[in-house]
Design a protein with these regions (language model features):
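A short glycine-rich beta-alpha junction/loop motif
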Residues: 75-82, 115-138
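Hydrophobic aliphatic residues
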Residues: 6-7, 25, 99, 103
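Amphipathic alpha-helical segments
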Residues: 1, 95, 131-170
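A short beta-sheet element
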Residues: 35-36, 45-105, 109, 123
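Short, basic/aromatic beta-hairpin or loop at an interaction surface
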Residues: 24-37
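Short coil/turn segments at secondary-structure boundaries
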Residues: 16-23, 111-112
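Short, solvent-exposed loop/turn positions at domain surfaces
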Residues: 42-45, 116, 148
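Non-catalytic DNA-recognition/assembly elements of restriction-modification systems
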Residues: 1-14, 129, 137
Length: 172
């Protein structure tokens, strides 16, 4: 199937009273209020796009770098972002990982338009034509559960490494 068989573009606008969201490379979609740094958003947010919980949001100019994520909450994003809403039942955990997988990121790069990487852009008409192989929902859920377990184990090991480094510094 194609991405367009799974997701449709959401272009609803005009809900400027909703929380402003942002897409980060590492943490996906999150409230802008939780991100350090200057807020470059427009004062007039009437043209900002509506995002609902479970929507995939991506930065059209940085999708080839993996600037995307599944939204954990309702909100609005800059008109520069593309918002995809699921057409079929999907596992958010699976799709969050799938859209950052090296093979799919490579497809995003190949389908982006522009003269140089500084100007590459991937809009919905291009992304909807990308072919993908999607497992059944039950398999998506199993993969997402496994990835979640691995992430938790990695976090525990990272914490252990930090503790050992502190212990080592204290021993010297």
């Amino acid at each position: 199937c194609h991405i367009g068989d799974i997701d449709a573009e959401r272009s609803q606008r005009g809900a400027s009273d909703m929380e402003l969201l942002s897409v980060t490379m590492n943490d996906g979609v999150m409230p802008r209020s939780e991100i350090e740094g200057k807020d470059n958003s427009s004062e007039d947010k009437s043209n900002y796009k509506v995002v609902l919980t479970g929507d995939m949001v991506y930065n059209s100019m940085r999708m080839w770098q993996g600037a995307n994520g599944i939204s954990p909450c309702n909100g609005i994003v800059s008109p520069a972002y593309t918002v995809l809403m699921p057409k079929i039942p999907i596992s958010n955990g699976y799709f969050a990982a799938f859209f950052k997988s090296p093979n799919l990121i490579n497809e995003f790069r190949k389908n982006s338009q522009g003269m140089t990487s500084d100007t590459w852009n991937l809009k919905y008409p291009q992304i909807e034509t990308i072919k993908v192989c999607i497992p059944a929902l039950s398999e998506q859920n199993r993969v997402a559960d496994m990835l979640g377990t691995l992430e938790r184990r990695i976090a525990k090991q990272a914490h252990l490494v930090d503790c050992l480094k502190k212990y080592k510094r204290g021993a010297i």
